[in-house]
Amino acid sequence: MNDPRIIVALDFPDSTSALDLVARLDPSLCRLKVGKELFTAAGPQLVEKMMGKGFEIFLDLKFHDIPTTVANACRTAAALGVWMMNVHALGGRRMLAAAREAVPPGSVRLIAVTLLTSMDQSDLDEVGLKGEPQDVVQRLAALTRDCGLDGVVCSPLETSRLRNAIGADFCLVTPGIRPADSSPDEQRRISTPRQAIENGADYLVIGRPITQATEPAVMLSRLNKDIEDIRDVSRFDNF
């Protein structure tokens, strides 16, 4: 598989647990996501170790700070050699533009988080964001595109609308992916792999259904098979 579409979320508290799981996966069949918990515990050394095993890494630290600080953080992350990194679109235009300037196009894929998949309408109302979740996501995605970033992280429930509004040359990364027979956990705006791809997602972030499976490699193969079954009838291969 030349361009694995599944990104396995390594939501572990330490490097030992993460590496135990990674040893059971094939780098040709998935990429790996390292988030705040694992990166805080294990640092860049773990990222380098996993890249040494052939895995491409999505560094999911959601940088959100003043423009100079975010630019410096992005530059440092890019120097690690990661495949993808993200910032938070709510940081605004100047922050997004500074991140793009620090990480030139064609080097690391630079994307932005729109809304966390744990947020629903009541959360938006409480923090004062106007509009329904899909409206807020579309505004933030348009801002991200205008600043020259490569794509956004968004709920699979927003992918179809974003794909139609923004077009094919914009990467949509979707967390909140669960097989039809699994628990939704704390995420509220979720979807199955098939639904997400049919709606226009490019990459699927999947954590517990794989990492907590009795046979993670078997579950990964099953999910990849689900994806392959619909690729020929989807715009999926055109990205």
UniProtKB/Swiss-Prot annotation:
SMART domains: OMPdecase
Binding-site residues, substrate: 11, 33, 60-69, 117, 178, 187, 207-208
Gene Ontology biological-process annotations: 'de novo' pyrimidine nucleobase biosynthetic process; 'de novo' UMP biosynthetic process
Role played: Catalyzes the decarboxylation of orotidine 5'-monophosphate (OMP) to uridine 5'-monophosphate (UMP).
Complexes and interactors: Homodimer.
Family: Belongs to the OMP decarboxylase family. Type 1 subfamily.
Protein name per UniProt: Orotidine 5'-phosphate decarboxylase
Biological source species: Nitrosospira multiformis (strain ATCC 25196 / NCIMB 11849 / C 71)
Name of encoding gene: pyrF
